[in-house]
């Protein structure tokens, strides 16, 4: 009982309205002298805030001008396409709507399921084909499926799509690292990539929101 009481006295008393502010103060303190690329700081810190993983200060790779290019695209009403419903759910729709934009996820669409079955591929890959067929500029936020990144790479090489930005942050072990490196090899395509195995739909949504919150 004494030990439990001691633990309770060690808990910081923070008002709900101050929780996020205090979290970012802790993140800044723990980053110490780590130098972040100008313009990327908020994105990196939000990824750390979302995951409690400071590796994102090292493994997030930004192509030159990616942040500015992405924000300009959002201002023009460019839609975001995700590879999971979770990623879609995590993006701030109200903020996105301020710029006349919206977010799509085609993973549950019947035509996507049918195309995946007919072509012997994944729904994630088929959903990228559907996004390409929109005939619009698109920002892609991929947090789960490396097959989505592979298909995007193929579509870009075939000249069928020119993404405004690819957020490449799938998590896992099979083809995850390789698919991210494919995106990094596309020197003409703006990208934000979490190198290595880490990432997730929550990180994909987090990066989208970090872009929105600094506009």
Model regions and ranges:
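Buried hydrophobic positions in well-ordered alpha/beta secondary-structure cores of metabolic enzymes
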Residues: 83, 166-168, 207
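Short glycine/serine/threonine-rich phosphate/pyrophosphate-binding segments
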Residues: 87-90, 146-152, 173-177, 200-204
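A short, well-structured juxtamembrane/interface segment
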Residues: 58-73
């Amino acid at each position: 009982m004494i030990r439990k009481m001691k633990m309770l006295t060690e808990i910081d008393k923070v008002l709900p309205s101050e929780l996020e502010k205090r979290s970012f103060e802790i993140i800044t303190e723990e980053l110490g002298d780590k130098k972040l690329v100008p313009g990327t700081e908020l994105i990196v810190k939000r990824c750390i805030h979302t995951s409690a993983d400071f590796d994102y200060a090292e493994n997030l790779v930004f192509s030159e001008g990616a942040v500015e290019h992405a924000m300009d695209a959002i201002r023009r009403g460019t839609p975001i396409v995700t590879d999971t419903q979770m990623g879609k759910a995590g993006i701030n729709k109200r903020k996105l709507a301020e710029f006349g934009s919206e977010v799509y996820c085609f993973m549950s669409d019947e035509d996507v399921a049918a195309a995946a079955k007919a072509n012997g591929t994944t729904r994630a890959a088929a959903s990228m084909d559907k996004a390409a067929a929109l005939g619009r500029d698109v920002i892609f936020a991929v947090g789960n499926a490396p097959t989505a990144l592979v298909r995007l790479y193929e579509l870009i090489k075939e000249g069928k799509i020119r993404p405004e930005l690819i957020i490449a942050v799938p998590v896992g072990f099979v083809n995850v690292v390789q698919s991210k490196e494919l995106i990094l090899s596309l020197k003409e395509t703006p990208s934000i990539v979490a190198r290595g195995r880490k990432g997730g739909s929550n990180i994909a949504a987090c990066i989208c929101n970090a872009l929105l919150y600094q506009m």
